[in-house]
């Protein structure tokens, strides 16, 4: 494969990893289990918010897996 395609694949994978870690960091920041949250003021998210967080975490994980497969196929 061309060096260009390898660079594009690795760049895509690094962008997907960055995006997914930012999603997971945002979810962790909003959770009550985070050490930076004052537990007295913490409210558990309702079911809709929890489902959205689960969906976003699954999306982030899927993006990293697909990106890894892409890089594996290209390289």
Swiss-Prot record:
Recorded name of the encoding gene: UL147A
Membrane topology: Single-pass membrane protein
A cellular component annotation (GO) from this entry: host cell endoplasmic reticulum membrane
Function noted in UniProt: Plays a role in the down-regulation of the host NKG2D ligand MICA by targeting ER-resident MICA to proteasomal degradation prior to the GPI-anchoring step. In turn, MICA reduction diminishes NK-cell killing of HCMV-infected cells.
Keyword set includes Membrane: yes
UniProt-listed GO biological process terms: symbiont-mediated suppression of host innate immune response
Protein known as: Uncharacterized protein UL147A
Keywords associated with the record: Host endoplasmic reticulum, Host membrane, Host-virus interaction, Inhibition of host innate immune response by virus, Membrane, Signal, Transmembrane, Transmembrane helix, Viral immunoevasion
Intracellular or extracellular location(s): Host endoplasmic reticulum membrane
UniProt keyword Transmembrane helix, yes or no: yes
TM region(s), chain numbering: 55-75
Signal sequence extent: 1-25
Primary location: host cell
């Amino acid at each position: 494969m061309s060096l260009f395609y390898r660079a594009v694949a690795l760049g895509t994978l690094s962008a997907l990893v960055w995006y997914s870690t930012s999603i997971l960091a945002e979810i962790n920041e909003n959770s009550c289990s985070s050490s930076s949250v004052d537990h007295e003021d913490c409210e558990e998210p309702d079911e809709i918010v929890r489902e959205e967080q689960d969906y976003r975490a699954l999306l982030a994980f899927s993006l990293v897996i697909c990106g890894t497969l892409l890089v594996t196929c290209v390289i």
